[in-house]
Amino acid sequence: MRAAGRISSRHLPLPFILMRCEDIASNPDFRRLSAVPDIAVDLRYAGVDNFVGRDLYGSLDCAWLHHLAAAGLERAVTLLAREAPGHRLLVLDALRPHRVQIQLWDHLDGTDMRQYVADPARGSIHSFGMALDATLIDPQGRELDMGSGFDEMTERSHPRLEARHLATGALTHEQHRNRELLRHALCQSGFQGIDNEWWHFEMLERQHVRERFVRVE
């Protein structure tokens, strides 16, 4: 794997390989989301429909994934077409530059909501193009009901608590089936989910990604 535009940086816990977001098109390790067939894309941080309430990407082109994650996404598309014809993956976030991760972290300063945002000092896996946020849309293009919204920072969003939510009625069986379908498509394709966000999926082990992959600034 090649690193483009290496930048030295102080105050980092790992010897990150860094690249400016503006240079990403020149790096062959990354693929545009538009090159992945049969997905829908609505990058929520490129608009105001997010927990910060403003466009965080501006002129930055963030519709990219590392080619390994893009290949996993393609596998998920194939699996979903076979097992739930007419349904598609809707990508809500993919590459997230480190400078944007800092803004998210700072926005939640002093709150207990920081559990939902990776500490920039460690590096978000989004910033390596190795994570994505996604949901599903039906054949009519409507988002499936997952029981909580994207970036909803409540316990209803926690996959590890789904059994409890089903028992109390906080999550319906249909909502749970929708989450299971999303997880099945992505986790059978090489991604891993996390405990507190049903929409978030990562490729490979975090420490390996942070040590070996290019972080986009």
Name each region found by the language model.
Residues 1-94, 104-196, 204-217:
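Extracytoplasmic cell-surface/polysaccharide-interacting catalytic and binding patches
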Residues 201:
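Conserved metal-phosphate-binding beta-hairpin within the catalytic cores
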